[in-house]
């Protein structure tokens, strides 16, 4: 009785709903699990326990869509035939140990990247391309034409609804594309418009500051209270450092442990500068 009670507390703490969800899933989903993550905080293991995802052996290939950094193009509606023949699979591993993964011994015929999307999981909320396994599988299903099943999968997580609140506009754009090239073009346009909007907001903010007059004569704010709430008031688009994203061209679905999260936070630099660098990096990468 003791361990069972402990698991319930751990699941509640990590944002997982109870075990009263359906134990099977209507579409075939799989993962290669490398055991890097905390089992109680791992979305892939959670889905495996619920019977939604099956675990693949190292050396076993997958005939459906494989979300992997070995992919050359993003997943698109054109991959629906592959999905219908085999489903979707992901790699369950830690960002911090990505170099340990034997990618030559896993994968399949339809290896794909993920286009620009923003994580909503508790570990990497608001970080582009930092999707975990559940989010990556949901994104794949949504893009190839199974939005209802994507939502059904994310219903297994207390925070799952936020993935669509954050990404629904982009997911709808991608789902209406014809193929990978179309998705790359839409992704590039979206990022360019996002950067332009960001720069416009920055310029307006600067104009407001100068129109306010001499700020030395204005009353000062209580900086201690502002600082204490800085984590809560961060923008959902708060970015990790460019160095922490240098190894992932688009996305690999993973679940991070506390050590990885600490490293990412330690590498954070000026938010404005990181925003510009990362958006430009992604825009330029679609030209190559």
Swiss-Prot record:
S-adenosyl-L-methionine binds at residues 43, 91, 114, 129. Its EC number is 2.5.1.157. It is an enzyme of class 2 (transferase). It holds the Pfam family Ribo_biogen_C. Residues 209-221 have a biased composition (Polar residues). The keyword Transferase applies. GO terms for molecular function: 18S rRNA aminocarboxypropyltransferase activity; metal ion binding; S-adenosyl-L-methionine binding. GO terms for biological process: enzyme-directed rRNA pseudouridine synthesis; maturation of SSU-rRNA. Aminocarboxypropyltransferase that catalyzes the aminocarboxypropyl transfer on pseudouridine at position 1191 (Psi1191) in 18S rRNA. It constitutes the last step in biosynthesis of the hypermodified N1-methyl-N3-(3-amino-3-carboxypropyl) pseudouridine (m1acp3-Psi) conserved in eukaryotic 18S rRNA. Required for processing 35S pre-rRNA at site D. This is 18S rRNA aminocarboxypropyltransferase. It comes from Schizosaccharomyces pombe (strain 972 / ATCC 24843). The lineage of its organism: Eukaryota, Fungi, Dikarya, Ascomycota, Taphrinomycotina.
């Amino acid at each position: 009785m003791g361990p069972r009670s402990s698991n319930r507390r751990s699941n509640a703490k990590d944002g997982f709903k109870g075990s009263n969800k359906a134990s099977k899933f209507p579409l075939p989903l799989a993962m290669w699990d490398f055991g890097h993550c905390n089992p109680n905080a791992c979305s892939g293991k959670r889905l495996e326990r619920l019977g939604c995802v099956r675990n693949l052996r190292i050396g076993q290939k997958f005939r459906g869509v494989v979300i992997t950094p070995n992919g050359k193009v993003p997943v698109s509606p054109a991959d629906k035939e592959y999905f219908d023949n085999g489903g979707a699979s992901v790699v369950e591993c830690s960002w911090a140990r990505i170099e340990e993964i034997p990618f030559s011994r896993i994968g399949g015929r339809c290896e794909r990247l993920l286009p620009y999307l923003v994580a909503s999981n508790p570990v990497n909320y608001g970080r582009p391309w930092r999707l975990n396994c559940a989010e990556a599988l949901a994104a794949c299903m949504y893009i190839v034409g199974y939005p209802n099943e994507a939502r059904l999968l994310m219903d297994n997580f207390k925070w799952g609804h936020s993935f669509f609140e954050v990404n629904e506009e982009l997911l709808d754009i991608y789902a209406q594309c014809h193929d990978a090239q179309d998705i790359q073009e839409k992704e590039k346009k979206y990022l360019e418009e996002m950067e332009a909007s960001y720069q416009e907001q920055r310029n307006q903010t600067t104009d407001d500051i100068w129109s306010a007059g001499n700020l030395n004569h204005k009353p000062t704010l209580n900086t201690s209270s502002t600082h204490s709430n800085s984590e809560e008031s961060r923008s959902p688009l708060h970015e990790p450092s460019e160095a922490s994203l240098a190894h992932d061209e688009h996305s690999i679905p993973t679940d991070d442990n506390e050590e990885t999260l600490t490293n990412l936070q330690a590498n954070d630099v000026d938010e404005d500068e990181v925003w510009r660098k990362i958006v430009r990096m992604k825009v330029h990468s679609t030209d190559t």
